[in-house]
Structures are given as C-alpha cells and as structure tokens.
Amino acid sequence: MSATQPILNSIQTHLLSQIDRFAIELFPDNPSEYFLRDESGAILIQYAGSKFERINSTDIIQQRRTVTIALTVIARSQHNDDGALAILDQVRLAIVGFRPENCLACALINEEFAGEADGLWQYQLLVQTETWQVEQTKAVDLPKLANVYSRKPTDPLNPILQPKS
C-alpha cells in the first residue's frame, strides 16, 4: 500500500477544483515524450523526496516524514491572464494550507524559473507537507484478559481469588 501516491492524488484533486484553465496532471513517467495538449498550459505534480527526523523511540519506530512535492508550471505565455505568472499566483493561493490525505497543511519552500523552450515557459514551485512513517509490526498473540474483579481496599477478597502463598 502506497503512502505517497494518495498525497499526490489528493493534491491533484484539490488543484483541479481550484484552477480551471490549465491541465493538472501527475508528472509523466517519460518526460521526453510528454506532449502539452492544453491550450494554456499544465501543472505537473511530482514527488521530489522526503526527509525523516531522528528516531527517539526505543520500542516501535515512528518518524516524522517531511514530504517535498514539485509543482511544475508549463505555460504558453508568461505575462497574460493565462500566463505562467498568473497561474503561479493561483497555485500558491490554492496549495498553501491545503492538507493532503494523512498530512499536515502544505507550506511553500521555493519557486524558481526553470527555463523556456519553444515558447513554453517553465517554473517550479516546491511545496512541503508532513506525515508519519510508522514501522509495520505483526500482531503478537498474548493471553487474553478473562475476568476483572474490582474492589475497594476495605472490601474483603473475592472468594474466587486465592492469595499467593
């Protein structure tokens, strides 16, 4: 079961509900063969890595996981209403504070110009969120609690119970 894919999917679903002029897709498996179909541009969502905090537990491993997501904006223009700069503004507003599945709210890390080629302007926005990575353990078959007898300190012992000899 993937913990990362649901994060990407929930970001995609959220951006689709907030931005209507651009295609919003997961980063392609083969970027060299990617074809921009949308007349305005696209926002590509990519897992960019994770960092884990130090282990402090002595029994089960549980670590805070800081997940980095790259949002690549590809636009056919830079300055008009459908341009890269306008869409970057919309993406920032949509993503800051959004909580992907099983995560804390998203925060911005960095944004930079990635280049221009054949009239396509590219910017990359790095976003981070946090979740937990927890060790998977097998259930241990321990004896089950059968009966509980309650009493106050002043009550006599239950006759079913025998004191240790």
Which residue ranges define each predicted feature?
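Residue-level signal for secondary-structure boundary sites
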Residues: 53, 77-79, 133-137
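Extracellular/virion structural assembly segments
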Residues: 60-66, 74-93
